[in-house]
A protein has these predicted regions:
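Glycine/threonine-rich flexible loop motifs
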Residues: 111-121
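Short internal beta-strands
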Residues: 51-55, 173-174
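Bacterial Sec-dependent N-terminal signal peptides
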Residues: 1-20
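Portal/gating segments that form or line small-molecule/metal binding sites
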Residues: 57-109, 113
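Catalytic-core regions built around general acid/base machinery
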Residues: 97-100, 121-134
Length: 248
């Protein structure tokens, strides 16, 4: 019996040790050179393969060119995953492409349309598999909102609304927290009425690192941008400014 218990203990220990640490880095605005550098650092690789997903911007060529311009001079191997493809020319599945990367960065745009395409193409399943493998996931705007349970979006006509995400992170989210004046009030309102759960909000130049689905640290590209933890307590909304590390 003692040997059996020891076996179970060792089996559980090595199984836990073999699981990759899951890293997810979100920021409130668009992709920048600074955020790419930080994502690259999270991989632990000297020259990481980083794949950009411009789905939310309909694979816009100017956005793709901007991505390559940002990566120029950085010690990274830049890739792009396009969804507007033909089987005549693309011979690898989306999953095959993504699983070979060290990091994946999702761009901004229309979150609702992006998620619909991902689900139709099973890219959402490939991203979950990549995340569980330990491939670093990152993104801003639509590219940050998508990872959360739900949050504020401009993906529908007329006004901001609430959208459900992939639920990799079991919190709500608000990007563009102070740069778009209607974001913060809408976020407060929906946390107060419990349409949204507690969650994290980011200014455009601020980001948050989650390790194994939990908050790890807040970073910023300047001293004026911050991230916040927002929740309901005693019938009121509480906003906690997170201690932030400036990155270059």
């Amino acid at each position: 019996m003692k040997h059996f218990i020891l076996f179970l203990f060792l089996f559980s220990y090595f199984q836990a040790s073999s699981q990759s640490e899951r890293k997810l880095f979100v920021y409130g605005g668009q992709v920048t050179k600074g955020f790419i550098k930080y994502t690259a650092k999270l991989t632990g690789k000297k020259k990481p393969k980083i794949c950009f997903l411009p789905t939310a911007n309909a694979d816009d060529i100017y956005y793709i060119n901007y991505w390559h311009k940002l990566c120029a001079g950085l010690n990274v191997e830049a890739h792009v995953l396009r969804v507007w493809i033909s089987s005549r020319y693309q011979k690898k599945s989306f999953e095959e492409i993504l699983m070979k990367m060290d990091a994946i960065i999702v761009g901004g745009g229309n979150t609702l349309n992006m998620l619909a395409i991902w689900k139709a193409q099973e890219i959402d399943l490939a991203l979950k598999k990549a995340y569980d493998k330990g491939i670093v996931l990152a993104g801003g705007s639509a590219g940050s909102l998508c990872w959360f349970k739900a949050g504020t979006t401009d993906s529908r006509p007329k006004k901001l609304s609430i959208i459900k995400g992939l639920e990799f992170l079991n919190y709500s989210h608000c990007p563009h927290y102070h740069s778009e004046k209607t974001r913060r009030p809408l976020y407060f309102k929906n946390i107060l009425n419990e349409t949204l759960s507690d969650g994290y909000a980011c200014d455009d130049k601020s980001g948050i690192l989650f390790l194994n689905n939990r908050f790890s640290k807040s970073v910023s590209l300047n001293a004026k941008s911050f991230s916040y933890y927002v929740y309901k307590k005693d019938g009121k909304v509480v906003e906690e400014k997170l201690k932030t590390e400036i990155i270059k």
